[in-house]
Swiss-Prot record:
This is Nucleosome assembly protein 1-like 2. It comes from Mus musculus. Residues 213-223 have a biased composition (Acidic residues). Residues 1-11 have a biased composition (Basic and acidic residues). GO terms for cellular component: nucleus. The keyword Ribonucleoprotein does not apply. The gene is Nap1l2. Keywords: Nucleus. Its main location: nucleus. Brain, specifically expressed in neurons. Belongs to the nucleosome assembly protein (NAP) family.
Length: 460
């Protein structure tokens, strides 16, 4: 018993020495040494199991040591396999994620940072361009103001245009003032050069609005009414009725927003203006809707302001989008009692459970309306439908308000329809070409089959 105990203590000391040697040596040597360990026949079954367990533990330690040595080698960058992985991940099929730049070689990474610095400088120049362009827009807005003011006066019957101002040559495109002067035609002649002057009115008789014919027709109507003994009361509307309502309803994006209960209010619009921010203020533009005094709300002016992104963020200067709208704010509408078209009021009768008394409770629910466009809550890029709202504000400022008469007359709609028809025709044309090509290919295939059949017959 004493010998077996001494032998067991000796084997345990040998295992500890062997484990310390494995930690000091490489994985290959530890594996060879572990394979060289033998079990003596006189040790007994218990000693054999302990030796096998020690061998398994030594192999695990060897694997951990090998992994540790591999990490150290990777940090030092001394293997040939690591040199092959220096290529960008984007070039070997990996997704371009945030760690892509970190995976690039040091020199390439420095060049990318240099490009980012150049991009930041370009964004600063773009921001400066936007501010100067806004100043130019402000300058020309003052030049447009007399024209827009006369438009307002004509719409609201403040000013009646003269006969000369109503002469409009509708068939002329790109008509310049130089073409309104007299043009000189030179025709060859045997006796010499004969100069014939062409009047500027030639070819435009059908384009003019003939006031003389209208006066004659009115005189005939008056005489007919006098002879018949009946008075003819013709409507003589002032200005252009429902001008802005018609303009807004002819805008595709605004059509679903305008409800029937909105139309009586929109008929009271006298003008819609675009006001640019003053010098020194943040870049923005404001849409101003001017109304007549009415029974619906106390406001005579409803506004919506769009603030433009004109400065770079210090923490992230790169996602600069140029003339992008950063956020928008509306205004509060002071509705008269019972006239709020953006809310639906429901009255409910409630009975008390104990006392049996009845009371009437009113509850308001939001309702679709054009006037939700003036919601006072600011809309930023984190909103849900901000892109549609920003696009609508941009179109109102750039296209709809400056060219309102074209939307009223339908000319803008015709141009949009022509664009759609052109696109459809292009698609139809492409389909015809494709069908012709496919038919030609099928004919060639049929000819080839016939030739193959003829060749087979000849061979037979």
């Amino acid at each position: 018993m004493a010998e077996s105990v001494d032998h067991k203590e000796l084997s345990e000391s040998n295992q500890e020495e062997l484990g310390s040697q494995v930690m000091a040596e490489g994985p290959g040597e530890s594996q060879d040494r572990s394979e060289g360990v033998s079990i003596e026949p006189g040790d007994g079954g218990q000693h054999g199991e302990e030796t096998v367990a020690a061998g398994v533990g030594e192999e695990g330690k060897g694997e951990e040591a090998a992994a540790g040595s591999g990490e150290d080698a990777g940090k030092c960058g001394g293997t040939d396999e690591d040199s092959d992985s220096d290529r960008p991940k984007g070039l070997i099929g990996y997704l371009l994620d945030t760690d892509f730049v970190e995976s690039l070689p040091v020199k390439v990474k420095c060049r990318v940072l240099a490009l980012k610095k150049l991009q930041t400088r370009a964004a600063h120049l773009e921001s400066k361009f936007l501010r100067e362009f806004h100043d130019i827009e402000r300058k020309f807005a003052e030049m447009y103001q007399p024209l827009l003011e006369k438009r307002r006066q004509i719409i609201n019957a403040v000013y009646e245009p003269t006969e000369e101002e109503c002469e409009y040559k509708s068939d002329c495109e790109d008509y310049f003032e130089e073409e309104m002067d007299e043009e000189e035609e030179t025709n060859g002649n045997e006796d010499g050069m004969v100069h014939e002057y062409v009047d500027e009115d030639d070819g435009y008789e059908d384009c003019y609005y003939d006031y003389d014919d209208e006066e004659e027709e009115e005189e005939e109507d008056d005489s007919a009414g006098a002879t018949g003994g009946e008075e003819v009361n013709e409507e003589d509307p002032k200005g252009i009725p429902d001008f802005w309502l018609t303009v807004l309803k002819n805008v595709e994006a605004l059509t679903p927003m305008i409800k029937k209960y909105d139309e009586p209010i929109l008929k009271l619009l006298t003008d819609i203006k675009v006001k640019l921010s003053d010098p020194g203020e943040p870049l923005s533009f404001t849409l101003e809707f001017h109304f007549k005094p009415n029974e619906y709300f106390k406001n005579e002016l409803l506004t919506k302001t769009y603030v433009l992104k004109s400065k770079l963020a210090c923490y992230d200067p790169h996602p600069y989008r140029g003339t992008a709208i950063e956020y928008a704010t509306g205004c509060d509408i002071d509705w008269n009692e019972g006239k709020n078209v953006t809310l639906r009021t429901i009255k409910k009768k409630q009975r008390h459970r104990v006392w049996g008394t009845v009371r009437t409770v009113t509850e308001d629910f939001p309702k679709d309306s054009f006037f939700n466009f003036f919601s006072p809550h600011g809309i930023s890029l984190n909103g849900g439908d901000e892109n549609d709202d920003f696009l609508l504000g941009h179109n109102l400022r750039t296209y709809i308000i400056p060219r309102s008469v074209l939307f009223f007359s339908g000319d803008a709609l015709e141009s949009q329809q022509e664009g759609v028809v052109r696109e459809v025709n292009d698609e139809i044309y492409d389909k015809i070409i494709y069908d012709d090509w496919m038919a030609a290919i099928e004919e060639v295939k049929a000819c080839c089959k016939n030739l193959e059949a003829l060749v087979e017959d000849i061979d037979r």
